[in-house]
Amino acid sequence: MAQNQSDTAKKDVVIKVRGLVNAFGSKVIHDHIDLDVYRGEVLGVVGGSGSGKSVLLRSVIGLIRPRQGTVEVFGQKTDEIEGPNMHRLEMRWGVLFQAGALFSSQTVAENIKVPLREYTAMGETLMDEIAAMKLNMVGLPPDTGDKYPAELSGGMIKRAGLARALALDPELLFLDEPTAGLDPISANQFDELIKRLQKALGLTVFLVTHDIDTLRATTDRIAVLVNKKIVIGTITELRKSDDPWIKDYFSGVRGRAALADMAEAH
């Protein structure tokens, strides 16, 4: 399902992936894949176990060097910049890793201030104010800032991690399995939070997930990693695919339920 040139020509490309090959030893994960992510959209990334969803995310943000191909973020090739230039680029995105990745020895507020300390010269008072503001933004009470990660529920850890990802007011947000491990109610609430923040802040979101309900609730388009390649479309478009995995995922019981929910919402 190729990207339609006439539909996309005027869109601002935030992430541009071309000819990407990722491999570990002789095992090829991604085989010459192309992907564009447009400003202001929520792109979901889904695929079976071992399809390399998180590997793709880490390739985009420069944590994994691809064997072949190029990755551009905001028009800059991530493998060609370093030092201060890379720092300036990193300040334009925020990342929420799957487990929250909070430092257990620091309070939630201190965790939120980590990127502020790393990338800015802000004073302590201003950092405290920003940490409090970000907690409020993700729906956590003020006293959460004084707690340690071990004192938080799974849903609160995800929200605290999101607050840290938003600390530098990024334009681009990477979310790696944001609802994994959450009960259905908490997952639904987190989906609603993502969509609300995306609209309010004008974010571009790159969202890795296995959850079709999250895809339905939050995404504009979906990139499916299958057979080392990538297929891109909406849920409705992907349901028409002849690929067995895609057909089963989007047209199975949960896929049909998600589509029914979409129809009711409209």
Regions found by a protein language model. Give the residues of each.
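Conserved catalytic motifs of ABC-family nucleotide-binding domains
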Residues: 169
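Catalytic Walker B motif of ABC-type/P-loop ATPase nucleotide-binding domains
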Residues: 173-176
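Conserved ABC ATPase signature
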Residues: 148-152, 156
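Conserved ABC ATPase "signature" region
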Residues: 77, 124-143
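Helix-to-loop junction immediately C-terminal to a conserved catalytic motif
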Residues: 61
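The feature captures the beta-strand-to-loop junction immediately N-terminal to the Walker
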Residues: 46-48
